[in-house]
Amino acid sequence: MQTLKEKSTQLCVYHEDKKVVDLWASQDDSFSPDSLINVFSSGKSLETIALASLVGQGLMNYTDKITDFWPEFGHKGKQDLTVAELMRHEAGLAAFDGSLDTQDLLTENIKKNKVGKIIEEHVQKYRPNGGSRREYHAVTRGWIVNEVFRRIEPAGRTIGEYLREDIGTPLGVDAIVGVKQEELSRRALVVPLGFKFVFWDSLKPRFLGRRMEFNFFQLTTKILRMIPVIRNSTTWGTPAPFKGMRGIRFFNEPSLAMGETPSANTHSNARSLAKIAAMMSSGGKFNDQEFLNEAAWTALHSEPVKATMGMGRSIFTQGGVAHFTPCNADSSKLDKAFNTGREGFYGWMGLGGSIFQWHPTHRIGFGYVPTSLNLVDILNERGKTYQAEVLNCIERLTK
């Protein structure tokens, strides 16, 4: 934390329901381990927990068609799409043709179907050059899942309401999709690292105080690998997801923070993510409290399918969490960057650095949340360094 370019950062780890690591650091006193930070796509794993709770109640299965619960979704040829395909990023809805108004994302407006109407009239699009149908739904998956969730949930709640009432309050954590007015002051705003800084700092050798994880040549190689992937995507050239968005700092806007974008705009902290992850690593239970029953937990982690998603090959379960597995001699460099150091973990990570993952075999709950966003570190290898060290510690403990 002291050697890399960090403004404020948090790291928390649970092992067998016990908090064993609780670190945070900042350049000023305005930051604390309980500060709220946008964890971006780490929120995707929270939306999977919400949906799994419906499976546990016998209200849906992942093999069901979305139109079983939301008939209007079938417009424009989407009638056969299953919940599992949506959760595995295979819905063909990775980006929308228009930008959404942040006011439409407020909980009360979601319940008026402001977002649902847009999704209903949207057509599916898959990569122009064919191949795998899996394409990362960076922002859109959460909007669609929220519409499915609220139509099935007995009280008609949104994901944001479920997380507050069924996860946040009983577990004593912050799992916030839709920040309330009185919570805005708790936020620590995200700060993207400028590309100029990234470029010049990467030219330094480590012994001269380089504050980036990778040197210039490593960064250049990673960027060059991603260019053809980006160009062969359905998101290339599409509008920004939000009206008025001019860059990543737009995520600091209160109007956006107060709306529900579960896949890209969840506010939490490392302590909370690690505790939720500890619950998930223990089969959906924490200190005798059950948050997901066995049927829900098992279904969420079942039916893993490997496919190319642009950033190398990924394994996603039917419930929508990634499973990180050991690599072999034939694995690509991207596959190794994605998996090595995370073997056995489930979950996901967020733009610029955050990680929210759990390891059922070793019963590890892991949460890492920085405010300094390294947008070039696409696979969150900065935080993976801590994950690898946690695995090393567990290995030494079990010898």
Feature annotation, model-predicted:
Residues 282-285, 301-308, 376-399:
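Short, gly/Ser/Thr-rich active-site loops of penicillin-recognizing serine hydrolases
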Residues 20, 34, 46, 53-71, ...:
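Short, well-structured active-site flanking segments
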